[in-house]
Amino acid sequence: MGGCEVREFLLQFGFFLPLLTAWPGDCSHVSNNQVVLLDTTTVLGELGWKTYPLNGWDAITEMDEHNRPIHTYQVCNVMEPNQNNWLRTNWISRDAAQKIYVEMKFTLRDCNSIPWVLGTCKETFNLFYMESDESHGIKFKPNQYTKIDTIAADESFTQMDLGDRILKLNTEIREVGPIERKGFYLAFQDIGACIALVSVRVFYKKCPFTVRNLAMFPDTIPRVDSSSLVEVRGSCVKSAEERDTPKLYCGADGDWLVPLGRCICSTGYEEIEGSCHACRPGFYKAFAGNTKCSKCPPHSLTYMEATSVCQCEKGYFRAEKDPPSMACTRPPSAPRNVVFNINETALILEWSPPSDTGGRKDLTYSVICKKCGLDTSQCEDCGGGLRFIPRHTGLINNSVIVLDFVSHVNYTFEIEAMNGVSELSFSPKPFTAITVTTDQDAPSLIGVVRKDWASQNSIALSWQAPAFSNGAILDYEIKYYEKEHEQLTYSSTRSKAPSVIITGLKPATKYVFHIRVRTATGYSGYSQKFEFETGDETSDMAAEQGQILVIATAAVGGFTLLVILTLFFLITGRCQWYIKAKMKSEEKRRNHLQNGHLRFPGIKTYIDPDTYEDPSLAVHEFAKEIDPSRIRIERVIGAGEFGEVCSGRLKTPGKREIPVAIKTLKGGHMDRQRRDFLREASIMGQFDHPNIIRLEGVVTKRSFPAIGVEAFCPSFLRAGFLNSIQAPHPVPGGGSLPPRIPAGRPVMIVVEYMENGSLDSFLRKHDGHFTVIQLVGMLRGIASGMKYLSDMGYVHRDLAARNILVNSNLVCKVSDFGLSRVLEDDPEAAYTTTGGKIPIRWTAPEAIAYRKFSSASDAWSYGIVMWEVMSYGERPYWEMSNQDVILSIEEGYRLPAPMGCPASLHQLMLHCWQKERNHRPKFTDIVSFLDKLIRNPSALHTLVEDILVMPESPGEVPEYPLFVTVGDWLDSIKMGQYKNNFVAAGFTTFDLISRMSIDDIRRIGVILIGHQRRIVSSIQTLRLHMMHIQEKGFHV
């Protein structure tokens, strides 16, 4: 019976047994969320409750075995009717309570077990209360009390229970509220029951003080309304700080609910059993969080508590961007084993890495050059006369090439090794020196270069022969380039004499010239650079005016003889006309010919067929008409935009048959399709480049030979070709003319045949069969073709592997000009489409958003083609929808490197995918970059998946948040729900995560595409952070 038993009751008039004194006074368990206002079991003295009338309720007090009082009130006036006996408590202070709970323990006699009381005995009693701000003393007015409830017993006892010494104790709890005054009274009304009130406990509930997630929450009283919660903001424990605002909600039953936010231990402190403790000496914690303190990394120490960073030992340093978890390092020792190799034009220095790298991987080298005379103690800086390839500072590889050195000179090269902490050390940088004496047999440098004259497109130069030629001079090499395009591209020519006339230059443009001499012993070094500027149109006109003035003056001098004067003017005028005509002819030739290449300055070399009112005029202007009898069609090889594509043979006059592909226009075509078909032929006819598909010609003539139907593409005939040919008609004298084609209707476009078809299908068919250098060769061919188009001011708009054709020699050629448009001379110009489908996966963001195309958008597409080639024809962005692709690119996501892709190629892809189109590389730069890779295949050996070392130049690494754990990284990108997936799959370090591909992300259970995209994008950023990008921007 609730764990507390009343053994006996004292019977009045024979109804109760005496109460046993074995009543346990501390039987009630009080929860820590209850505040007790009254508990009769703990009162040591008399309760002093008031009874009305006096002979109603009786107070009985007994002592238990611990000599503690047991206070009981009982009443059993069941023999008399109309009972109204009241028992009132003393005044009870409500404290902070808004709602109180009354717990009553009592026994009640079954009326049926008492004889002769059926009309007067009751089995319930009533509970009342009254609020007041102070005690009323003995005054009692029942009508001032409010009824709480009628209390009935769950179990009642009988005479038999008394005989068997069985006590049935009832426990009832009632709640009262809201309580607004300072206190209250309770009253119990008996209306004729036989009852013993064993104990009364009055309490209210609270949410007790607690500590959750390192945040303290005070005692909180819940609201009266059980459906509402009280929001409580916590305060962090000592040495902790908020990560997110800590909150708890207090429920009506005194329970804390819905924990939100948390506190974390500050730097230098760790969590131990719900509080933050300072890190011990020799340990540190660099970041606020609930991780443990870590032992100081090698070569660092601390003697204090609560340390956030360990101090480096003497002679060791920590770079600015080194994480606190990284060991302290020191500068490297000097490089070793310096050797050199010299020829007529270049000096190659090589060395071994230092024996002590200082514990770092960001090792770089610098080469300092000094020129020394016979006395090596007197040296001077080499100045800017020498060129170092790739540079003389910040070298990553342990070699450098020196150019433009002078013969007969002693050069001393000091090679220094440095790392990320070298600048923090005050000790002199160790170096290894080597002295090289240049070839005494090679010729010395030439003398000063002079400009003899300059015209609008030409410059005449002369110079002094070298002081020491050491043999007969064979010739001079002159290298020159536009000053504004320095180091991008250059031209060269040769001269037998110490003078030259350079033609084909741009007007009013500064050029830089370098000259060296060649003898039987080899080349000299290049001279210092000399700058000269071509003339403009105004200067040429002034020269002509000067010539006229001289002629006129000479004419006036012969005024004495009229006949002689007349003859003089006639002869002079004729010579003048002849000279001018010759000069203009020569100038025209120079304008069109420069070092063997035709140039047309200021003239747009591509003509848009849309400028022709009749598209057939453009076709005849740019495409060669082919006699249909020379074409033999063999089979269908595919379907194009306008019809089917067949393979066949073309017989050329005086030559053997060549394989060709024939594009046809399907029957029942619309006028717009006919115009577009003509337009593509007109476009292709203007191109002549080994990496652009070659147009052999078109068939558009009205008359058609009587050739067998089986010679044509069968489905081409079924599509309506025969219906477009007029039937043969009779002629006088018998016979008939051959069938005719309606006027102006295009029939066929004939192009060169590419045996291996489209590049994407070809790569998928030969997955993994090619070397990296072969793939780079394919990419170089595509870039060369696109450079040709870009130089003509032409935008392709649909560059993709499916539109690249491959011949039997693996030569790749750009094709499919259906979407192409002309680009104006303005370098910032872009073409705006008027509609039509855009290939989203290959198209630059600005072209998708604003339908603006430029050579820069073609560069973006070229980056996608690179990815297709290196992945052997995989679909870009895999199964992502077009909308997901657009959103991903806007969020900064870029395709990861395909498996086995060299880092240099993926870096080029990323440059092509720059969001700002002006930052993307030009096709000229791309071709030059790929040429360098082909000439230096070792640059292709480093794969993206191999680049897992720390950056070699911390100052050049982009900013990136530093995370201690993989979980922190996932939380930062709001992907914390996948922590267990990463741990279960073994991806517990950033080294492993940086290697993950999209397939790995799917494999560990990331199903949602949006989540895959966010994680892969962050991994790309992480991987770039771990890579060393030697210089910002794109360089060739």
From Swiss-Prot:
UniProt: ATP binding residues: 637-645, 663
GO term, biological process aspect, one: axon guidance
Extracellular side: 23-550
Swiss-Prot/TrEMBL keywords: ATP-binding, Glycoprotein, Kinase, Membrane, Nucleotide-binding, Phosphoprotein, Receptor, Repeat, Signal, Transferase, Transmembrane, Transmembrane helix, Tyrosine-protein kinase
Location of this chain's protein in the cell: Membrane
Similarity annotation: Belongs to the protein kinase superfamily. Tyr protein kinase family. Ephrin receptor subfamily.
Name assigned to this protein: Ephrin type-A receptor 6
Gene (UniProt): EPHA6
